[in-house]
Amino acid sequence: MRPSDRTPAQSRPVTITRQFTAHAEGSVLVEFGDTKVLCTASFEEGVPRFLKGKGQGWVTAEYGMLPRSTHSRMNREAARGKQSGRTQEIQRLIGRSLRAAVDMKALGENTIVIDCDVIQADGGTRTAAITGACVALVDSLNWARGKGILKTNPLKFLIAAVSVGIYKGEPICDLEYIEDSEAETDMNVVMTETGKMIEIQGTAEGEPFSHEELLSLLELAKHGIREIVDIQKAALS
């Protein structure tokens, strides 16, 4: 039995609120249950030095958690003077995932900077961030097309992400914090809207998992992401 009484395949309620802030070209508040992440997409002219003159764009991401997004306050990383390894890992994951969804040639020599700030954390912050950032990215691309900066749509497909894991011996989808902290296996999966894999991050926290359990987890993720993509499409319609 899960703490929330959800079935093993059941995700938390997902809500996507677009145009959540006034200034960014794309901004989204994404909620996976009690996990809430603000995702903005800023469209900027120019590209990093290593891409200058190559006729293609770039998508990059930053990720952070507000000090009281967790049960007890944590210091801002800026106050500590450096980012944690976890933060660097997550923002690279977000950037990689979103770059898979964009035709960089069609983007031209422009950069989209994604900022994901966790307002409240209850597990699955990175998967919520990817899901919300994708919608913010779409809005920023539509803004650029509306301004005549882009002639064609660089978006190849929507992407979304969900966590899966083995909790008390049972594969489950979309882990909240209490499940994540006690899971024998924890996995984050990023997929396209058609069910193709972009990234799989999986770790046996306790007992090693079998090939059959891996396939079961991926099937749960595919089902969960399909539902999340439907919510993205409804938000964008």
Swiss-Prot record:
Enzyme Commission number(s) of this protein: 2.7.7.56
Q: Does the keyword Cell inner membrane apply?
A: no
UniProt entry tagged with the keyword Acetylation: no
Could you tell me which InterPro entries the record lists for this protein? ExoRNase_PH_dom1 (IPR001247), ExoRNase_PH_dom2 (IPR015847), ExoRNase_PH_dom2_sf (IPR036345), PNPase/RNase_PH_dom_sf (IPR027408), Ribosomal_Su5_D2-typ_SF (IPR020568), RNase_PH (IPR050080), RNase_PH_bac-type (IPR002381), RNase_PH_CS (IPR018336)
Q: Name one Pfam family in it.
A: RNase_PH_C
Name the residues that bind phosphate. 86, 124-126
The record ties this protein, via Gene3D superfamilies, to:
GHMP Kinase, N-terminal domain
Name the chemical reaction catalysed here.
Answer: tRNA(n+1) + phosphate = tRNA(n) + a ribonucleoside 5'-diphosphate
GO terms of biological process kind: rRNA catabolic process; rRNA processing; tRNA processing
Q: What Gene Ontology molecular function terms does this protein carry?
A: 3'-5'-RNA exonuclease activity; tRNA binding; tRNA nucleotidyltransferase activity
Identify the keywords attached in UniProt to this record, alphabetized. Nucleotidyltransferase, RNA-binding, rRNA processing, Transferase, tRNA processing, tRNA-binding
Q: Where is the signal peptide?
A: none
SUPFAM superfamilies assigned: Ribonuclease PH domain 2-like, Ribosomal protein S5 domain 2-like
Q: What does this protein do?
A: Phosphorolytic 3'-5' exoribonuclease that plays an important role in tRNA 3'-end maturation. Removes nucleotide residues following the 3'-CCA terminus of tRNAs; can also add nucleotides to the ends of RNA molecules by using nucleoside diphosphates as substrates, but this may not be physiologically important. Probably plays a role in initiation of 16S rRNA degradation (leading to ribosome degradation) during starvation.
Family according to the record:
Belongs to the RNase PH family.
Official protein name in the record: Ribonuclease PH
Write down the species. Answer: Shewanella sediminis (strain HAW-EB3)
Q: Which lineage do the record's taxonomy fields give for this organism? A: Bacteria, Pseudomonadati, Pseudomonadota, Gammaproteobacteria, Alteromonadales
